[in-house]
């Protein structure tokens, strides 16, 4: 009886734990138990054989292992095993970005506004060349004019403007500055405008001259490496300006100079930074901390004493064509309750970057829809010849060719001059040119005396050249932002423009990948130029290469290849930048013995 009862107990225990014939049956049986024994009737008809004690224990171990593998419960922790979970990036949308004022990036009759739509101060006259307001101007100017007519009692809100190249951003701060200066002469410095390159300084000064009335009430001074430092200092001392347009390095040089009198920033009303993305990540250590310190009132909330003395922090206006991609970096500018004016994706080539999105504006660049892009793929040894054929085939009047290195510009200029004899003039513009030589060369190009201008990226930012028909990337740009800035030299103010990029099969692969990631590939046309296409020009091309080889060999013997281009104007000397290391000499107290 005892053995019979043990057998019955064993049968009862094994009704729910029948070992199947194959390995997959373990999982089937576990599923059956989990589902509430729905198939009890069919299983009950089967007769289970008695199991030995060792078999039961082995079956239990298998069940534990399978259960742990399925993630239902973990019996033992496996040493060295780490469970990783993919977490979604936290997306934060700043309120000032979410409430941005948008405008169309396309300039045409449907988006432009009549001049009567904006009421200008009486002392400002509209130049005859301007017939309408562009979208960015119509969006920004009314609010800035209102603050000038009715100044807020406390610190005004700062402004960030993200608009495509050639959309008319410069007027968005030129007119408010002239309105703040007023119609009566004064010796108060109202605005400081900072730009990254010398050529842009001269361009902005010319824009002020266009809008300033005949009496010239507003005194505008340019400070850059194109002028002699001591001459600039004497000009500042004899006739204090209302507006300063400068490069950051030259402004710091004047602010820290021992030549009296110093520039007074205590009553500054506008601090404007054009092409802000070009200023670099060390701009705060190099010059921004110094300017904010001398302005005063930027590190604390305005108090009653500041209101009585009419001393307040200046209003910052930050502009760039790629500003919307660098929304995170705007924190470096220490903007006060900023207002964002941004181009919309409607009627514009919207370029969404592949970087993680912080908000709905970050990661976007805008390129005018009037620009067409073509990618020419050929062997590197035929690149100069491909550029020559593209220029002559399309009959461009003004062509800007971008290169990455100075040596490339010299070689390409020599070859194109040989190929283009008796057809058109070719010249090259690099950062090694100083003083008047820069402006003379740009003036010749604007007057169409030079049909082709080879340049480095010193002209890729902000510089407005007259009616550039085509931009050629002889060396492909390293990133999408540089591509947008280069392309922005053509197709300005709603005009048609063409961009031609030249590369080989290897560089094409990386370049196309970059454009597709940022949705810049779009309507790009790809053209393959095989060797037989160049046969008609091969004799002239061979002679040009022989001439280049002889010139390089001659320069190597005489050392001429190492000589820097002859400079005119003042002799520029590179100085160390102590502030780049985070030093702030203006904060150091003078020690008394």
Swiss-Prot record:
**Domain Helicase C-terminal, first and last residues per copy:** 386-533
Organism of provenance: Caenorhabditis elegans
Answer yes or no on keyword Ligase.
no
Can you tell me which residues bind ATP? 163-170
State its role: Probable ATP-binding RNA helicase.
Motif placement: DEAD box: 377-380
Region of interest (Disordered), residue spans? 1-69, 552-593
GO cellular component terms listed in the entry, alphabetical order: nucleus; P granule
Keywords on this record?
A: ATP-binding, Helicase, Hydrolase, Nucleotide-binding, RNA-binding
PROSITE patterns from the entry?
Answer: DEAD_ATP_HELICASE, HELICASE_ATP_BIND_1, HELICASE_CTER
Indicate, by first and last residue, each region the UniProt record lists as having compositional bias (Basic and acidic residues).
580-593
Reactions catalysed: ATP + H2O = ADP + phosphate + H(+)
Which ranges are annotated Polar residues under compositional bias?
A: 552-561
Q: What is this protein called?
A: Putative ATP-dependent RNA helicase ZK686.2
Name the top EC class.
Answer: hydrolase
């Amino acid at each position: 009886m005892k053995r019979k009862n043990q057998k019955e107990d064993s049968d009862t225990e094994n009704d729910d734990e029948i070992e199947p014939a194959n390995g997959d049956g373990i999982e089937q049986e576990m599923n059956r138990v989990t589902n509430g024994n729905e198939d009890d009737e069919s299983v009950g008809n089967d007769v289970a054989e008695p199991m030995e004690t060792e078999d039961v224990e082995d079956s239990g171990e298998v069940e534990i292992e399978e259960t742990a593998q399925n993630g239902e419960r973990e019996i033992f922790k496996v040493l060295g095993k780490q469970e990783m979970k993919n977490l979604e990036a936290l997306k934060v949308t700043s309120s000032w970005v979410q409430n941005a004022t948008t405008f169309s990036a396309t300039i045409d009759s449907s988006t432009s506004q009549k001049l009567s739509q904006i009421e200008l101060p009486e002392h400002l006259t509209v130049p005859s060349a301007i017939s309408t307001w562009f979208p960015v101007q119509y969006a920004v100017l009314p609010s800035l004019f209102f603050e000038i007519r009715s100044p807020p009692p406390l610190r005004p809100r700062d402004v960030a403007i993200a608009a495509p190249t050639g959309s008319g951003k410069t007027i968005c701060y030129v007119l408010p500055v002239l309105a703040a200066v007023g119609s009566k002469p004064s010796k108060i410095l109202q605005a400081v405008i900072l730009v990254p390159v010398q050529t842009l300084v001269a361009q902005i000064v010319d824009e002020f001259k266009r809008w300033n009335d005949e009496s010239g009430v507003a005194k505008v001074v340019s400070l850059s490496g194109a002028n002699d430092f001591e001459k600039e200092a004497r000009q500042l001392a004899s006739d204090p300006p209302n507006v300063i347009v400068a490069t950051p390095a030259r402004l710091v040089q004047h602010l820290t100079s021992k030549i009296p009198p110093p520039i007074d920033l205590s009553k500054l009303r506008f601090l404007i930074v054009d092409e802000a993305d070009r200023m670099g990540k060390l701009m705060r250590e190099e010059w921004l901390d110094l300017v904010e310190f001398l302005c005063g009132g930027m590190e604390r909330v305005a108090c009653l004493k500041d209101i009585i003395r009419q001393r307040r922090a200046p209003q910052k206006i930050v502009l760039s064509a790629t500003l919307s991609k660098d929304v995170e970096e705007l924190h470096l500018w220490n903007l006060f309750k900023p207002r964002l004016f941004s181009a919309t994706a409607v009627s514009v080539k919207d370029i969404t970057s592949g970087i993680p999105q912080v908000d709905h504006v970050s990661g976007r660049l805008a390129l005018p829809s009037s620009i067409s892009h073509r990618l020419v793929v050929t062997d590197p040894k035929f690149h100069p010849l491909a550029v020559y054929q593209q220029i002559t085939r399309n009959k461009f009047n003004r062509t800007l060719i971008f290169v990455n290195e100075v040596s490339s510009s010299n070689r390409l200029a020599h070859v194109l001059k040989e190929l283009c004899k008796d057809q058109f003039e070719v010249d090259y513009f690099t950062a090694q040119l100083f003083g008047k030589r820069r402006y003379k060369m740009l003036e010749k190009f604007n007057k169409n005396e030079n049909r082709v201008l080879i340049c480095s990226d010193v002209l890729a930012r902000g510089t407005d050249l007259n009616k550039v028909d085509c931009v050629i990337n002889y060396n492909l740009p390293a990133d999408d932002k540089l591509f947008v800035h280069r392309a922005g030299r053509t197709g300005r103010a709603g005009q048609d423009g063409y961009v031609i990029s030249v590369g080989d099969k290897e560089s094409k692969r990386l370049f196309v990948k970059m454009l597709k990631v940022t949705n810049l590939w779009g309507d790009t046309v790809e053209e393959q130029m095989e060797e037989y296409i160049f046969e008609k020009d091969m004799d002239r091309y061979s002679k040009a290469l022989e001439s280049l080889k002889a010139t390089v060999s001659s320069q190597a013997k005489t050392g001429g290849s190492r000589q820097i281009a002859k400079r005119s104007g003042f002799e520029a000397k590179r100085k160390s930048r102590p502030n780049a290391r985070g030093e702030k000499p203006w904060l150091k107290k003078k020690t008394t013995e």
